[in-house]
Amino acid sequence: MAIGITACVLSLINYQGLAYSAALINEPIQACVIAREVDLTDDIRTKFAQCLGWQADQSSPVCLGFYKPIAVTPLASPDEVRILADTASFYRTQRSTLSGHVEMQQGQRVVNAQTAYVYRDPKTNEVTKIEFLNHVRYLEPDRMMIARKAVVYPQDKSGEVEDVLYRFNTNRSNALLPAWGRASLIKRFANQDYFLKEATYTTCAPQDKAWAIEAESISIDNEKGKGIARNAKLRIHEWPVLYTPYLSFPTNRDRKSGFLMPIVGYSNVGGADLGIPYYWNMAPNYDMTLVPHLYTKRGLMLGGQFRYLTSKSTGTFNGNFLPKDKAFGRFLQDNEVEFPQIRGLSTNRWEVNFVDSTQFLSDLQLNVNFQQVSDDYYLQDFSTNLASVTQRQLLRQADLTYTTENWTFRGMGQSYQTLHPINEIPVSPVYERLPQLMARGYYDDLPFNAQFNILGQYDQFHWPNDSWNIALNNMPQGPRFHLNPILSVPMMKPWGYVTPSVQFVENYYDISRNYTWGTSRANYNLTIPRYSLDGGLYFERDLHLKGTYYIQTLEPRLFYLRVPYYNQTLIPVYDSGFMIFNVDQLFRTNRFSGFDRIGDANQLSYALTTRWLEDESGAEKANFSIGQIKYFSERRVQLCQSPTGFCTDNPDTFGNLSSTFGTSPVASRAVYKFNPAWGITGDYIWDPATRATNNADLNLHYQPARNAIINGGYSYLVNGDVTQVRNNDTENNALHQAILSAAWPLSEKWSGIGAYSYNISKNYSMMSFLGVQYDSCCWAMRILGGRIFRSLNEEFEPQYNNNIYLQILLKGLGSVASSDPSGILNTYIPGYYDPFRRR
């Protein structure tokens, strides 16, 4: 009897399990085929675990087990069909029957069953369909299906199975285990996409009831790397908690379009919050996320983020818009009589933020940073970060930089939006630079090892119109030209160095002031030389400490600076200010920031630094520095500006030091690493003029494991408090704050997270949150309660934004969150490991 099956080899042999190891499934296949409508009991789940190849392993603390791999040895030809069976009956004009340990293999696809029927095209005699019954097991790379019935179409490699228990190994973004579930029908298409009817889907272990999707249908698109569930219910521990007609989820690590999990939450300033994010994967190099939010106290906000990445550019655009904010409208109505400056403000709230970096050529780069909000209270109402809530200056800047071997050229435009919340001392606006043109040259190959630096900069300063303080609208403005050439001759030896340097600073101003009666103009030209001599020595010795060999260095340094005095109080202050004194300021050539004030100097800085370096690796174990400046004359240049040419700086101004005392504060710094997990850094500055601390900070970091962190910080700065209000007095105007933050495992799966910041000088907390986090094999959860300092009320009592964060991550599916607190956690817990960001 002729078989006549094209590209098909039929063999009658005793079953040996040639293409698949039967050890993967310990229970008979029949026990795995259970009708879809039958509820999953613990016994059934145990059977399913065995059927799917689950191997319990208590040494795996998270998942408590693993799946045995699906191994298929492919045939030499992907089109070859090989069938094995105990017995077979073949016919030309009717279906052929195979019985007993049937195994069919085509390429990398293997199907096992007790019975199979082979159908052929009567004209071509080619196999068109093979039907499998009883104890069906369908295998492909990373795919396993156990079913009552299966049909395979060898021509296009499609197929379908009925009453299925399946396991799909897909490369999901953060799931630790493959997906598994049941379906009444699974269709496998020629392009290797799948359609599941009346199906369940989960990435939990078979005996874990944590979560599952139950859907009318699930479509899996392998090329796009996504799954779509329709008419789906999310079950948590078998209880239905959410219904959605459409749910999209990833099946690999690629980005894909679709709705994300809903956002739910509550805050005292916005009320209940419901959001439906939609992610649009527009192209491989740019995407967009749209997030409509419904706030019960405010209204409907539409937010979005657009990201792009090209061969030359990378950037992000963020925007939010909330029309007719109900809560803000009530705020305006309640306060416009007492504070008329807020009268007429729109209740439409919005924010835009744009960041871009474009590399046109290897030596030509454009950077843009732009942020603007609708009103002075937007950040207070919508930000969850203390740094943003208390921010009062929003940068808007674009610069174009061209770099050569010896020169850098830059053109820049810069301005700020200044926020003026009521009940605060008004923050002075910042001058606009429209434009700034800069050229900087550097040559280090001159004769006698000399180095030459030159900086030329042109700034056109504009004073922004400020409706909050009309008196400031006649502020000086106009162009400034700054030139600063520097010639130095470093003389270096292994044991030390000496570097003499000479330079001069030239500033030219063309100043105008606008008055009601007209405009006044004035010109100033200032040329000031600077002379300095910098020298230091290097000593080192071997050090043996607790079984480890170190090299200890001792580095004394002297720095003499001479700058003659020139009265500069007639010149406006565009960008200069006092600086916080620390070790770094010991060796600066100007005690003021910016270019508008050139500090006079006749002084000698002296400092001593010691380092401990590991002998083998060279890693720094410790670094201690201490230093001071000896003044040989009083400092006469003042920061203040006066049309008379005479003024005196306010001694309580932020960063101001005594101009008559013979020495500077003593500055010290320490960095010490006890071990790779534990380190401490700190600065302490003692001012002998006031016999008190000028500023200090101390930071501790302990991280013995990736998910175990403790941070502590303390800051003190005279006149540095950032929460100034109208009734402040000098005594409590120091920045005096402490912060403690931690993320610590409580067990294999549970951890605690929290942070607390306290304003010691004003006696109230600035920020606090506390929560717990659970991270298991197939899901993670964290709940945090916290508050962020917002402002002070009319009685100067602190007001807070109170938030509750609830975030649930279903690994392999997505997250449900009140709002993602990852930014807060990463800000206040440096080094924090976030399981919700696992990739």
UniProtKB/Swiss-Prot annotation:
Q: Which InterPro entries match?
A: LipoPS_assembly_LptD, LptD, LptD_C, OstA-like_N
Give TM regions: none
The keyword Coiled coil belongs to this UniProt entry's keyword annotation: no
GO CC aspect terms: cell outer membrane; transporter complex
Q: Which GO terms describe its biological process?
A: Gram-negative-bacterium-type cell outer membrane assembly; lipopolysaccharide transport
Subcellular localization: Cell outer membrane
Pfam families with a match to the protein in the record: LptD, LptD_N
User: What keywords appear on the UniProt entry?
Assistant: Cell outer membrane, Membrane, Signal
Q: What is its main location?
A: membrane
Signal peptide residue numbers: 1-21
Record's function text: Together with LptE, is involved in the assembly of lipopolysaccharide (LPS) at the surface of the outer membrane.
Query: What is the protein's name according to its record?
Result: LPS-assembly protein LptD
- The species is Legionella pneumophila subsp. pneumophila (strain Philadelphia 1 / ATCC 33152 / DSM 7513)
Classification from the root reads:
Bacteria, Pseudomonadati, Pseudomonadota, Gammaproteobacteria, Legionellales
